[in-house]
Amino acid sequence: MAAAVLGFAASTAPALPWQPADDAAVLEHVPARSELERLAPLRAALMAHPQDLQVALALSSGYIDIGRRNSDPRFIAYAQATLLPWVSRASPPERALVLQAIALQYLHRFGAALTLLDRAIALVPLDGQAWLTRASLLELRGDYPDARRACARLMLRADEFAALTCLASVDGRSGRLTESYSALRNSGGDPRLPAPLRAWRLGALADMAERLGDDRMAEAYLKAALHASRDDPYLRAAYADLLLRLGRPVEVVALLKDSEAQDPLLLRLAIAGRRSGNAQAGRWSQLYDERLRAAARDGDSSHQREQAMYLLEVRDDPRAALEVAARNWSVQREPADLRVYARAAARANSPHDLAAIARWCAATHYEDHLLSLPPAARVAERPL
């Protein structure tokens, strides 16, 4: 979410090179040349004027964008390295703190990200991006009361669209699912809004529709969201998960066949290939397994949800999947995290974990049609 990271790597002895089982395996993804070339003028400008904050912010934002769209944490590290001279100051600029927090969020360092956001808000109390990022982090961790308070602060900026979408998303996970879904649907989507904002609203509607048991509308909203932001890896993963659950793996292969470079999407390809009998299924599974081992070697534990899914759906190892899913649940609590945890607990026959899930749902008033299925149906259900 890294000059510090890069500096640490440079100051230690290099590890022995790790060789994949398949010499043809692609372990790293190099983003399209056009993406990197787009940032070349900013890199040159920052080298010429290292004290230019606006250039540093633009370059770090570009790195974060590339890293997010390509699921490539190296570019998040580049963003952190670009921001480090600014956030290390005794009085760091507020915008640098917010961007560094966004980078930390990507790396799942949520506590550190919240600390930076609190510092940024202390400097600029009405910064909408800081409050929205804070709300997103708190919602992701399942801290719905504090997330709602952060959403409400957006109203002070007269940012009605962001506030409404933010509040609907949080309220929809804390006891007001039907009302929040209706309110967000009736709010309409202004076509003049930037595509990422339209996609955010549509993605939130898709999540609510699925938890209400309306798969038809969930799919329609996801398709519309992808139309607004077709390269968003999170939306593509969500749509793939829906198609897998509905027993349509061939469509997942068609959707993601050119997405091997992005680990979360490669996982969905491996699952879909296995289900559909695709000739590439074994290669996709092996490639994902090698990516997992490479991530473990590098100390990267930011995709534990996907690791649990892999252990459950490809390796058919519910006990190992449950261990990873429970560890992931202690860090982040999105609907997809809960479903993977619940499915692993059911498959591993763990009453303790199922009871813990039930207690959390009761305490937060969380609603999900898929989780209301009886245990036997949960076990038989396709990936969450």
Briefly describe each language-model feature range.
Residues 7-95, 379-382:
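N-terminal leader/linker segments that initiate helical-solenoid repeat arrays
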Residues 63, 70, 104, 138, ...:
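Residue at a conserved register position within TPR or TPR-like alpha-solenoid repeats
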Residues 45, 85-86, 119-120, 153-154, ...:
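Canonical positions in the second alpha-helix
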Residues 58, 99, 133, 166-167, ...:
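Canonical tetratricopeptide repeat
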